[in-house]
Amino acid sequence: AESEDPGKTLLTDAVNDATSTLSNSAANAIDKTIPNSRTDISITSIDNRKTRYNIRNVTGFAMSSDGLARNFMQTSLNNANSRTVLNIGFGRRFLSSDEKWMTGINAFFDYDADYGHQRASIGGELKSSAIGLTANSYQALTEWKSGKDSNQEHVLDGYDIELGAQIPYMPGTTLFLKSWKWSG
């Protein structure tokens, strides 16, 4: 096997380090500007000109008077496979009075900025320190459209459900079971 060009490897490493530093600085600046905010920014594949990025922000709003419920907003902007997708969602999470269980509900809207596809979803979650269950239902809001390479495409309806459980005596190890179905 051929070895990589050391100059190219050095340049790639420098670009990746600079990108990571700038991404972290931008995320920190956003979080300092927006109270109760957590932002993640990821940029990859710059060297092969198929750049992918993901910007996600979760902002928590005021707690309920008893401190056991909180509303949140999640926004994201993703670019992969020559598609840019915007996502916005709102939810509410509830903590049990004994603080052992968290439940939540959410609603999201997805928009493909390149081709105009739209989808809405609703979901729920139930989590403890040892087990978690999430379920989401997705509904297409747009019909068939001309998409990438002029192919006809459309958003699918569907659902997903995931169960995760911590494996006893193996801290930090969780086993997940996931099922999904898409139709349309």
Outline where the language-model segments fall.
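Transmembrane beta-barrel domains of bacterial outer-membrane proteins
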Residues: 1-122, 126-130, 137-150, 166-184
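Outer-membrane beta-barrel signature, preferentially recognizing the C-terminal barrel domain
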Residues: 152-159
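S-adenosyl-L-methionine
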Residues: 162-164
